[in-house]
Design a protein with these regions (language model features):
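GHKL (Bergerat-fold) ATPase N-terminal catalytic module, capturing the glycine-rich phosphate-binding loop
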Residues: 1-189, 193-194
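Compositionally biased amphipathic helical and low-complexity segments enriched in hydrophobic
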Residues: 50, 313, 337-340
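Short, hydrophobic, well-ordered secondary-structure elements
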Residues: 115-116, 333, 337
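A short, sequence-level motif marking secondary-structure junctions
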Residues: 139-147, 245, 251-257, 341-342
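Glycine/threonine-rich ATP-lid/beta-loop region of ATP-binding domains
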Residues: 172-333
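Single conserved hydrophobic/aromatic residue that forms the stacking wall/gate
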Residues: 340-350
Length: 350
């Protein structure tokens, strides 16, 4: 006699809001999915955080709190939605760890359940570049939150619609050439709260800091740029102070190296003058101690290069780990690179 596992409808909670127990992690996973889809830009927008009807309405309206994550990646067609997005634990990362000239960043197939962690409803809009129509998939996560031992997750029927550009605009979504828009509605967490004499936006500030981890500090040298933008229109209109606004609104940059300049000792070497010279600068806590400009003996091979080596004391190491979530020894340690060269002398380390 053969047996098999049963996927009870409560599986959604186990791999959704119960597993992903942090809002920042949930949003980061969704941004990683956009990165893996070759998006050049991802916009994260919070709507109706201050005044909404979340507690007074059963479903949702135009005044209900929303988190909208929009990317310009490759997008999906109905086969992608059916065979990939709705296929629990399906992950492109399992098949290939590198695509679109990028190392894939997403988790192993459960990132889409981050939407459940963040809100009660989801409207997923998507379009591939070659298509003239938009696909809308609607999910009400409450449909999976029933106490029924016999009901399996595949018993919940999900419907999709094909939308024209006009129909998309009527739903308040700006048309796009390709990509995905996740409209997460009726947010489960309180992202801001009133604290006399102003709104406390610390949770949004913390999100911005957390998302910096996905941005390469060396992005200026990367061919494939990836931008993350955080928006909260209610507070952008209200807050006229540019410095305060920059804490959680606008493009997210990883400034860890810039901050390290004022907390560590560094040696910076840059090839200049089309490879003719090298400029070496020694700095301590942001102050130049010594510099020297010399002839580049390898001008035939190196025309344009820049290298910065930081010496981190215990305080600087702790700061780096707090900012990036990575121990310095696991990020760019000279000792680590030496081990790679010894074990794989032909491998190029960039």
């Amino acid at each position: 006699m053969n047996l098999h596992f049963i996927t009870n409808v409560q599986l959604k909670n186990i791999i959704g809001k119960d597993l992903i127990n942090n809002d920042n992690i949930a949003i980061l996973e969704l941004v990683k999915n956009a990165f893996d889809a070759n998006a050049k830009r991802t916009d994260i927008s919070f709507v109706n955080l201050k005044n909404n009807d979340d507690l007074s309405i059963e479903k949702y309206s135009s005044r209900t709190s929303r988190l909208i994550i929009r990317d310009n990646g490759v997008g999906m067609d109905i086969n992608d939605i059916k065979n990939k997005w709705l296929n629990i634990a399906y992950s492109e990362k399992k098949k290939k760890s590198y695509q679109h000239n990028r190392m894939m960043a997403g988790a192993k197939g459960v990132g889409r359940f981050s939407c459940d962690r963040l809100g009660e409803f989801l409207n997923l809009y998507t379009k591939k570049e070659e298509s003239s129509e938009f696909i809308l998939l609607q999910l009400n996560w409450r449909q999976f939150e029933v106490d029924d031992e016999k009901k399996e997750i595949q018993d919940v029927v999900l419907e999709y619609e094909i939308l024209s550009t006009t129909e998309l605009e009527m739903r308040g979504i700006k048309p796009f050439k390709h990509g995905v828009v996740l409209e997460i509605i009726k947010l489960r967490s309180q992202w801001v709260y009133w604290e006399q004499p102003k709104w406390n936006t610390e949770k949004l500030v913390n999100l911005r800091t957390y998302l910096e981890r996905l941005i390469n500090p060396n992005q200026a040298f990367e061919k494939n740029d990836f931008g993350i933008y955080l928006n909260a229109p209610e507070f952008e209109e209200e807050n006229k102070n540019a410095e305060e606004k920059a804490k959680f609104i606008g493009r997210i940059e990883n400034s860890v190296f810039e901050k390290l300049n004022f907390k560590a000792t560094s040696i910076e070497c840059e090839v200049q003058d089309n490879g003719a010279t090298t400029l070496t600068t020694l700095k301590d806590k942001g102050e130049t101690i010594f510099w020297i400009k010399e002839k580049n003996e390898f001008s035939d091979f190196i025309k344009d290069a820049k290298c910065i080596i930081f010496y981190l004391n215990p305080y600087s190491k702790a700061f780096f780990t707090k900012q990036t979530g990575i121990r310095p020894v696991n990020y760019g340690s000279i000792y680590l690179l030496s081990l790679i060269h010894i074990s794989e002398p032909t491998r190029r380390v960039v």
